[in-house]
Amino acid sequence: MTGDDELAIFSTCPQSRDSTPEQYARRVAETARWSEAAGCEGILVYTDNGILDPWLVSQLIIESTERLAPLVALQAAYMHPYSAAKMVTSLAYLHGRRLYLNMVAGGFRNDLLALGDETPHDARYERTVEYAHIMTRLLAGETVSYQGERYTVSNLSMTPALPAHLQPGMFISGSSPAGLDAASRIGAVAVKYPKRAGEETDQAGERSGMRVGIVARASEQEAWSAARERFPEDRKGRIAHELAMKVSDSHWHRQLSDMATATSEQDDPYWLLPFENYATFCPYLVGSHERVAAELARYVELGFHSFILDIPASEEELHHVGVVFERARASVP
């Protein structure tokens, strides 16, 4: 499983709320090493009001690996674009490593309201475009003067300079029209939460990625047994999901929640139970290596080339993921 010009595979870092302080640093380092050994290009590091700072977690990831690139979630409400650019160039200067940035407009309004931020959904994407515009120009070595609706800078430059080969790759979370428009304007990979492959549309040459979890085994029975063991039915989780829906204005969150899930598990690898139980925020593909690989190949044929996986349960899980991506890659012309 490698990140190359055709497919780029990212895992996801554990969240600090799921561990004690004593356990967390060990889990981050361990997951990062698993991901690197599995051939992942990078690893997503979340951000929100209830977890550790993603930049500090990213430094731990860099120190624990040789080449794995943190995909740092970047929320405009938390940090000025100059500060974000300074973080990127500082880590590059200290470690000689490239980062990826996942621009997050913010889907949970309560987090934003707690910060005094009442910016509406679409306007948050406009803010993200301005933010990325300033940040990327600084990282490119320009002296930036800019006056927009939300940010104003004058003759601003970045020191130390960022080498060209360490310029960050950029993603943006969002599948709404505003999110897709923002992705196009800033040249970012649009990260979507996919529908079933048979219901997805051709990406028509767009730079598209997806968030998806995978549980694959040699047989369908083994895969579903492992999936149900990891994600059992959870009434409290369903209640938490329903409460979260009431305070979210996220397009993808509502889209997934509205999807029908009556299809029999054994007949359909696309599985939303973990999402419905508030155990994760993406759909899962579950089944035999062959079945999941075939489903992934359908997404690749539609134009999806970047895949951000869920938090790996174990090193073995990443091995199975590697098997399905190799088979999917081999089956696509």
Regions found by a protein language model. Give the residues of each.
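N-terminal beta1-alpha1-beta2 module of alpha/beta enzyme domains
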Residues: M1-R67, Q147, Q167-P168
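Active-site mouth loops of central-metabolism enzymes
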Residues: L7-R26, A73-A77, P81, L166-S175, ...
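Acidic-and-aromatic substrate-binding clefts and catalytic sites of carbohydrate-active enzymes
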Residues: I43-P54, A77-Y82, K192-E200, A216-A218, ...
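Alpha-helix-loop-beta-strand connector modules within alpha/beta enzyme cores
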Residues: P54-Q75, R127, Y131, G322-P333
